[in-house]
């Protein structure tokens, strides 16, 4: 299952996984799983999380290692209603709901995810996605950026 992921996706999942693997032991607790998935634009229900945890936590020790996590994410991505997921993810970033993601909004969300970015890094992320050059990211630009991964 995980072999269907691109190197870029695997690197992205590893980075997200590492953010929540506070002690660096290669495992995250099951209650952190929901937080990790939401940081990647997924929106699992409590019931879905319980099902995934049951599937992934083979030894029932309450933690999930990275290979288990990758398989889980590959499965979840395969049956994702991506249009709906993208809309939800966009709303998370677009704090004032004006239809645009500003540098300030991007910085706010990334900080909440534990990513301390410099102004230059935030500006670079906006520039990469900002096709029309207006200094912010609209929904179409966001979708194009997300699907390009």
Swiss-Prot record:
High expression in stolon tips and stems, moderate in roots, and very low in leaves. Localized in the meristematic regions of the shoot and root tips, the tip of the developing tuber and the vascular zones of petiole and tuber. Not detected in mesophyll cells. Keywords: Acetylation, Calcium, Metal-binding, Methylation, Repeat. Coiled coil: none annotated. The modification N-acetylalanine is found at residue 2. Pfam families: EF-hand_7. GO terms for cellular component: cytoplasm. Ca(2+) 3 binds at residues 94, 96, 98, 105. Induction: 5-fold induction 30 minutes after touching. The modification N6,N6,N6-trimethyllysine is found at residue 116. Ca(2+) 1 binds at residues 21, 23, 25, 27, 32. GO terms for molecular function: calcium ion binding; enzyme regulator activity. Gene3D superfamilies: EF-hand (1.10.238.10). Ca(2+) 2 binds at residues 57, 59, 61, 63, 68. Residues 8-43, 44-79, 81-116, 117-149 form the EF-hand domain. It comes from the Eukaryota. SUPFAM superfamilies: EF-hand (SSF47473). Ca(2+) 4 binds at residues 130, 132, 134, 136, 141. Calmodulin mediates the control of a large number of enzymes, ion channels and other proteins by Ca(2+). Among the enzymes to be stimulated by the calmodulin-Ca(2+) complex are a number of protein kinases and phosphatases. This protein has four functional calcium-binding sites. Belongs to the calmodulin family. This is Calmodulin-1.
